[in-house]
Regions:
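Secondary-structure junction motif
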Residues: 55, 135, 141-167
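N-terminal winged-helix
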Residues: 30, 34-68, 78-85, 229
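Alpha-helical "hinge/linker" immediately C-terminal to small N-terminal DNA-binding modules
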Residues: 6-37
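Short beta-strand-to-loop elements that line the ligand-binding cleft
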Residues: 70-79, 168-181
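Short beta-strand-centered segments that line the small-molecule binding cleft or hinge
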Residues: 16, 58-62, 80-123, 205-210
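A ligand-binding cleft/hinge motif common to bilobed small-molecule-binding domains
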Residues: 96-106, 158, 179-208
Length: 246
């Protein structure tokens, strides 16, 4: 030692024991950290691009905190085509999406959510309504319906056209690669779009909304037997976070 003191045999044993204990404590600490990481509950969720679900995520975080539960949530936005591809290939743990996209897929579990109110988006510069008071769907019968390009699935297009055909409207259509291009052309009064209240377009200052007499079924979906406990927790929390909105 620095003082020149020499440990007695029993002192040496105590010293060696202390060094060994310090080493073992460090090893146990690392082992505990590794185990904690392995046990961490986490989910990676896909959502359709253009959907604004921030307020719901914040409500979920409050629910988790007040209940003392832990669930790490990360989110990515995709086109419908990429969303389904990521889901099938297990690149995401689950998704929030229109139920119509999930029903045709095999080996998928899902939890129904409260349906979303559909809206018709049109430019604030659009000509006044025919009745001089308020718009109806009939006011747009001669306008173009602006749609997302149908790559892997025609379900969203069929859903929108089916609604209009039930109203006796068979519109000319134009397809786009992404939702931002649709919203831009709608704001320029080049047509109208059918969307829902989670769409960014519903809050765009250049657009107006006409509430439709239709609601879209939606769900949280995930591959069967894949991250089941975490996904079920997420699905239940997400549904609960929607309840005050209904």
């Amino acid at each position: 030692s620095r003082t020149g003191a020499v440990l007695s045999p029993i002192g040496k044993k105590y010293y060696d024991l202390f060094v060994e204990m310090e080493k073992r404590l460090a090893e146990l600490s690392m082992e505990a950290k590794r185990e904690s990481l392995q046990l961490e509950k986490s989910v990676h969720i896909g959502v359709p691009e253009g959907w604004d679900v921030l307020s719901l995520i914040e409500k979920m975080e409050v629910l988790l905190s007040t209940r003392g539960e832990e669930l790490k949530m990360t989110f990515s936005a995709y086109s419908y085509r990429l969303l389904l591809s990521q889901l099938r290939n297990h690149q995401i743990d689950g998704c929030i999406c229109p139920k119509g996209l999930i029903v045709p897929l095999e080996h998928m579990a899902f939890l129904d959510l409260p349906p979303l109110q559909n809206v018709l988006l049109y430019s604030r510069k659009h000509c006044p309504p025919e009745n001089g008071q308020e718009y109806t769907v009939k006011d747009f019968r001669k306008e173009k319906l602006l749609l997302l390009e149908q790559e892997d699935t025609s379900i969203p297009k069929a859903y929108q056209l089916g609604f209009l055909q039930d109203k006796g409207i068979i519109p000319e259509t134009k397809e786009y690669h992404n939702i931002d291009s649709i919203l831009l052309d709608v704001s320029l009064d080049k047509g109208f779009a059918i969307s829902d209240i989670w769409s960014r377009g519903a809050f765009d200052r250049n657009l107006s909304c006409l509430k439709l007499d239709q609601k879209m079924p939606i769900c949280v979906a995930w591959p069967e037997n894949h991250s089941f406990d975490e996904m079920r927790l997420f699905a239940d929390l997400f549904k609960e976070s929607m309840e005050p909105l209904q």
